[in-house]
Regions:
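ATP/adenylate-binding site constellation spanning eukaryotic-like Ser/Thr protein kinases
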Residues: 82
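Conserved phosphate-binding loops in nucleotide/dinucleotide-binding enzymes
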Residues: 1-13, 67, 71-72, 163-175
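Acidic, turn-prone loop/beta-hairpin segments
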Residues: 32-59, 91-178
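Catalytic adenosine-cofactor/nucleotide-binding cores of aminoacyl-tRNA synthetases and other
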Residues: 1-41, 142-150
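Active-site-proximal binding-pocket segments
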Residues: 88
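Aromatic-lined ligand-binding clefts that engage carbohydrates, nucleic acids, or primary amines
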Residues: 74-79
Length: 178
């Protein structure tokens, strides 16, 4: 195995990006609990889109784990955090999170999506970032309500309930304009 300062720096940067994504999500769920969830049908379209994207990511990462392609799993998670979350979704929803009333439908819709993202992403990183995922799990009361540890939780669940067919081609055209 080859190791160099460049590889270690790149790995550190990937870890930092993933960790900071979780920090942002956790910071915006501090006043949110499961009673505040919005039904998927009533969510803002952008929030539906990101849920659909994380479900697609989940399938891809699980397939990578099943074929022992851990590098592909890491790359997929990192690219999702950088491109879909950092590059699009989180940048757009900041205004809603910071300016809307605490109990507004728009803010709760976003927080519902962030809660789903947290739940899915933490399970996806657990095989590769075990200490980080467990630390996040222990800090989040809504996750502790499910199980005592991320490693005792079901890896994939509830996709049938929340997955709706989203026209991803339409969203790609919108993001190209951006």
């Amino acid at each position: 195995m080859v190791a160099s300062d460049e590889i270690l720096k790149r790995t550190s940067d990937q870890y930092r990006r993933i960790r900071n994504t979780f920090r942002f999500i956790l910071g915006n769920l501090n006043d949110f609990n499961s009673n505040d969830r919005i039904n998927h049908e009533n969510q803002v379209e952008l929030d539906k889109w990101i849920i659909d994207e994380v479900i697609n990511l989940e399938k891809k990462v699980i397939n990578s784990y099943e074929t022992y392609s851990y590098h592909k799993a890491v790359q997929s998670i990192h690219n999702f955090c950088v491109n879909e979350l950092g590059g699009i979704y989180l940048d757009i929803v900041k205004d809603r999170l910071y300016t809307c009333k605490n109990n507004s439908i728009a803010r709760r819709s976003c927080q519902t999506s962030l809660d789903i993202l947290l739940n899915k992403l933490i399970k996806l990183i657990s095989p590769i970032l075990s200490y980080t995922s467990e630390e996040i799990w222990q800090l989040c009361p809504s996750l502790l309500e499910q199980e005592d540890s991320v490693f005792l939780s079901n890896f994939s669940d509830n996709n049938e309930k929340i997955s709706m067919k989203i026209d991803s081609g339409e969203w790609k055209r919108i993001f190209e304009i951006k």
